[in-house]
């Protein structure tokens, strides 16, 4: 852990009853900071996502990475696929909305300075959360799927930066085109950034089979730029 950061697991209430947990990372000794909800890949709340949370915290954000699988983590793609398929969409959104409310209550001065970033499965949920949470000021889905039905996007009120790789067979050119059309149709302030030589999950530096350093660095710079403009002003 970076010496100038504080990390811990926190617990928060979820609408409808019960609680959920999240990995929290924040600058040490700093006053209130804007918030970022960070949504995991299909592997679970693993060390890579915790590392990304700390990288964001190093840029003066308070980061909450909710544990959508409630403690389960895997490196097996078949297991990850099964867990993702079994995850109830509405329950996952209740957890994410609970994390959002938790931050708003803990950091009231920045209650309207919150963004969401997600990767892979988390990218899909980042876009869905933007559909459900008008309080968000920025949404940055990395190679996530589109909301189904797509007309949910008409409720998005924040800028969206959608990032994907040109070699991605899951988030393919047809889906990207559908997203662009939805941005236009529903009046969403959306930007799509495609890296032609990058594959799905190109940001994950723990996966040498797909990690693309140049694309990852450029995407990170653009993501930080949007978060800073929308959350720190």
Show which residues each predicted segment covers:
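Short alpha-helix in the alpha/beta-hydrolase fold that links the catalytic acid
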Residues: 172-182
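C-terminal catalytic histidine-bearing segment of alpha/beta-hydrolase fold enzymes
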Residues: 186-233
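Primarily recognizes the serine-hydrolase "nucleophile elbow" in alpha/beta-hydrolase
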Residues: 97-157
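Short beta-strand/loop motif that positions the catalytic acidic residue
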Residues: 156, 162-164, 168
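Hydrophobic residues in well-ordered beta-strands that form the structural core
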Residues: 64-65, 141, 192
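Serine-hydrolase catalytic machinery in alpha/beta-hydrolase-like enzymes
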Residues: 1-2, 9-109, 202-204
């Amino acid at each position: 852990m970076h010496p100038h950061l504080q990390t811990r697991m926190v617990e928060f209430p979820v609408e409808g009853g019960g609680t959920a947990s999240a990995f929290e990372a924040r600058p040490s000794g700093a006053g209130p900071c804007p918030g970022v909800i960070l949504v995991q890949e299909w592997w679970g709340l693993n060390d890579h996502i915790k590392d990304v949370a700390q990288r964001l915290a190093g840029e003066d954000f308070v980061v909450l990475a909710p544990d959508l699988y409630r403690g389960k983590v895997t490196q097996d793609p078949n297991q990850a696929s099964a867990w993702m398929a079994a995850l109830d969409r509405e329950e996952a959104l209740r957890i994410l909305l609970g994390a959002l409310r938790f931050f708003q209550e803990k950091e009231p001065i920045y209650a309207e300075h919150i963004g969401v970033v997600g990767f892979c499965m988390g990218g899909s949920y980042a876009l869905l959360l933007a559909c459900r949470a008008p309080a968000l000021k920025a949404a940055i889905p990395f190679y996530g799927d589109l909301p189904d039905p797509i007309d949910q996007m008409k409720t998005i009120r924040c800028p969206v930066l959608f990032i994907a790789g040109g070699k991605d067979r899951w988030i393919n050119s047809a889906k990207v085109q559908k997203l662009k059309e939805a941005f236009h149709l529903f009046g969403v302030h959306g930007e799509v950034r495609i890296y032609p030589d990058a594959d799905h999950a190109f940001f994950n530096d723990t996966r040498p089979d797909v990690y693309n350093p140049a694309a990852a660095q450029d995407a990170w710079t653009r993501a930080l730029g949007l978060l800073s403009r929308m959350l720190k002003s």
